[in-house]
Regions:
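A catalytic-pocket lid/entrance helix-loop region that shapes and gates access to the active site
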Residues: 154-254
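C-terminal subdomain of alpha/beta-hydrolase-fold enzymes, centered on the catalytic histidine
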Residues: 221-449
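Alpha/beta-hydrolase fold nucleophile elbow
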Residues: 127-140, 144-145
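Loop/turn elements at helix/coil->beta-strand transitions in domains of secreted/extracellular proteins
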Residues: 46-49, 76-79, 129-132, 154-157, ...
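Alpha/beta-hydrolase active-site loop
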Residues: 101-125, 212
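Catalytic-loop region of hydrolases
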Residues: 1-79, 90, 97, 104, ...
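Short beta-to-alpha linker loops that shape the active-site pocket of alpha/beta-hydrolase fold enzymes
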Residues: 56, 84-88, 93, 165, ...
């Protein structure tokens, strides 16, 4: 219980029938969009509304029960909402995930969903201009939070965008720059050793060493292996100590001990894997991505791959000389999935990325009352807003947390939090409180009070 209340009893799940295509007035087909509501803290009828926006995956009751936005909702007596992104989780196009149906999957359609959802909730709870809406999100949904405020400023008064990659980028090689420089060389050495073993024909030994389900004889399978190994390091850097397998310092500590780099990489993989063997079949990976049935909706890879092909890129390549992983991880390898899975030409990708940045403003958007929060060791900060436009803004629009990783600010307060994280959360709280106070003052002025 919190403040004598039992929030779980106040959580309700609902569905709203959204148009599959908001921009075609002749289209009549709909899909069910899932949402959660928590009224435990809400001060009727004029309390604020805190909207948690779902990203590239399912939402959960947890999204209206825990997190920094929930802590603030309790303080400000807000109505809590969480809404699922179209085509993820249970909010699926009932006609399957075939390519022709994915045409309605885009961030633009998702923002239109939010606008319709705003209207639906306003009618359902008899809300009015007296209820101030603030949106929250992290990573892709953080970008949606910023864009929702940017495109629909009359609906949402302020937005918190945590670790939000608002700039689309085709070749996101800069993702790899965040790896701790102290173990950069030894990681490069380890990946080079695996490559040498593969190129030297020692594929059977590599399969044994890394517990592969298949012997990586095919070049595509070898690339799958290298991507699997790189993912361990990428995930560690992205989330650092926020609940991932190990921290950067722990990983670097293992990599820089007296053993051979290859052996250490092998041990690290085996210690992090929960599977009986490492599936490196490229053919199976592609087959999984081609699965269009609704039962595969919990696996988000097909939908998100489509969005990377049509809107964002975000391909974490390794052709840059500074990349510590394998040079086998190329832009060509990543983008060849676009024509293979969806019939989208690789040559069309740059224009699609340019459109996204033109439409939203990239990392230099002219947004007001959007707070961009980023961690100093989060690779995605490269695509977010990290500097204030001081000459245009009355208040800061960025918070930079020197020693934290991806979306660290979004969790509830903990006694073990770093001082910098506690300070950042306090800054976020101050912004939200200031927005609510300003909104209340504006409403009083309009009423002539």
């Amino acid at each position: 219980t919190v403040s004598g209340r039992q929030p779980l009893k106040h959580v309700k799940e609902g569905r709203i029938h959204q148009p599959l295509d908001h921009f075609n007035r002749q289209a009549v087909n709909t899909f069910p969009q899932r949402f959660f509501v928590n009224e435990a803290y809400w001060q009727r009828p004029d309390g604020p509304v805190f909207l948690f926006i779902g990203g590239e995956g399912p939402i959960f009751e947890f999204d209206v029960l825990a997190g920094h936005h929930v802590d603030m909702a309790e303080e400000h007596r807000a109505l809590l909402l969480a809404v699922e992104h179209r085509f993820y989780g249970d909010s699926i196009n009932p006609d399957s995930l075939k390519t022709e149906n994915l045409a309605d999957l885009s961030s633009q359609q998702a923002l239109a969903d939010l606008a319709v959802f705003h209207q639906y909730i306003s009618q359902s709870f008899n809300l009015s201009h007296r209820n101030t809406w603030i949106s929250f999100g992290g990573s892709y949904s953080g970008a949606l939070s910023a864009w929702f405020r940017g495109k629909f400023p009359h609906l949402v008064y302020g937005a918190v965008a945590s670790s939000a990659p608002v700039k689309a980028k085709l070749d996101f090689s800069a993702y790899n720059n965040a790896l701790n420089s102290c173990c950069l060389a030894v990681v490069q050495e380890a990946f080079a050793a695996v490559e040498v073993a593969l190129m030297g024909g020692n594929v059977s030994q590599v399969a044994v060493d890394f517990g592969c389900c298949q012997i990586p004889k095919d070049p595509d399978d070898q690339i799958e292996l290298m991507q699997n190994l790189a993912d361990i390091f990428m995930g560690t850097v992205q989330y650092n100590e926020e609940g991932f397998l190990m921290s950067i310092n722990e990983l670097c500590g293992l990599m820089t001990n007296k053993s051979e780099a290859y052996e250490e990489e092998m041990k690290i993989y085996r210690s992090t894997s929960e599977e009986p063997c490492l599936d490196i079949s490229h053919e199976k990976a592609v087959k999984d991505l081609m699965d269009t049935s609704l039962h595969s909706s919990r696996r988000t890879a097909r939908q998100w791959t489509y969005q990377t092909c049509t809107e964002f890129g975000f391909y974490q390549t390794c052709e840059d000389a500074t990349c510590p992983f394998s040079g086998m991880l190329t832009l060509q390898v990543d983008t060849q999935l676009c024509p293979l899975l969806f019939g989208i030409s690789q040559h069309s990708l740059p224009a699609r990325i340019t459109f996204t940045n033109t439409y939203y403003g990239g990392d230099k958007p002219h947004t007001h009352r959007v707070l961009y929060v980023n961690g100093g060791i989060d690779p995605w900060q490269e695509l977010s807003v990290v500097q204030d436009r001081t000459e245009e803004e009355e208040e800061a629009q960025t918070i930079f947390i020197e020693d934290t990783a991806h979306c660290a600010d979004m969790t509830s307060r903990r006694v073990t939090d770093r001082r910098s994280l506690k300070k950042a959360r306090k800054e976020i709280e101050n912004h939200v409180a200031r927005w609510l106070k300003t909104a209340a003052q504006e409403k009083m002025e309009k009423r002539g009070v």
